[in-house]
């Protein structure tokens, strides 16, 4: 698949799986909602219930920015299966203003954020490599 098609498929997914590296080298993977703008992905710590706003994924990124994100499409007709992976480097923006382009992109994408925009830390991933697969049978 061409890069534009990989981006299009990735952006069409409502959720991605974010994989980061724990300080001890073990992988850590969680589902996230996100907005994609070009080769930059944004995901915020929002008001959904959590034990803490200082999440493991944020601690991992602060220690090691390497990450990968995966979206996929599955259905019983295996001729329609596909997946897209985005490999990149992440950073944490601790207190982004409401005008931050990432916050604005999330507000545009998710109705839930229109009444209560995310106010917690913002994860910003610069995608360095797109890869994917689609069934051809």
Regions found by a protein language model. Give the residues of each.
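Short beta-strand segments
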Residues: 14-50, 69-72, 82
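Compact nucleic-acid interaction/catalytic patches
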Residues: 44-45, 51-67
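Short, basic/aromatic recognition patches
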Residues: 1-17
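Amphipathic alpha-helical interface surfaces
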Residues: 6, 53-60, 99-106
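Charged, gly/pro-rich active-site loop segments
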Residues: 1, 74-137
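Short, surface-exposed beta-edge/turn micro-motifs
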Residues: 13-15, 64-67, 119-120
């Amino acid at each position: 698949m061409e890069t534009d098609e990989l981006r299009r498929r990735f952006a069409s997914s409502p959720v991605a799986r974010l994989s980061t590296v724990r300080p001890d080298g073990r992988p850590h993977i969680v589902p996230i909602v996100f907005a994609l703008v070009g080769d930059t992905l944004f995901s915020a710590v929002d008001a959904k219930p959590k034990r803490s706003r200082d999440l493991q994924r944020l601690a991992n990124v602060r220690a090691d920015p390497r990450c990968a994100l995966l979206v996929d499409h599955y259905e019983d007709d295996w001729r329609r299966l596909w997946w897209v992976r985005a490999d990149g480097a992440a950073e944490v923006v601790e207190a982004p203003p409401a005008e931050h382009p990432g916050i604005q992109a999330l507000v545009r994408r998710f109705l839930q954020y229109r009444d209560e925009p995310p106010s917690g830390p913002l994860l910003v991933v610069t995608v360095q490599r797109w890869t994917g697969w689609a069934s051809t049978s």
